[in-house]
């Protein structure tokens, strides 16, 4: 719970916090299910009074299993406001976030010259 409190304090003090909403990173190119942690953390931080912006990001490497010094691309989608999901469930939030992340990942895959089916479900 220390890490959760620390994350909320980072957000409250207007620092940026990077979270992989899947809970981990995959090295085999397979999609992971989004966890509930990002939504819950953002809601906790929002209770402290600060508006919360979520910035979906897609990352792609030259190879499905990255090698040392491989190239990569990171594409950043338009931020959205947590308040837009004030009355939404975790599943509704994650559905929207996943679609934003997938858009960013497609753009990143194109940037590194990989086929779209290398990464998509």
Q: Language-model features: where?
A:
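A cross-family acyltransferase "interaction/gating" segment
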Residues: 16, 24-95, 99
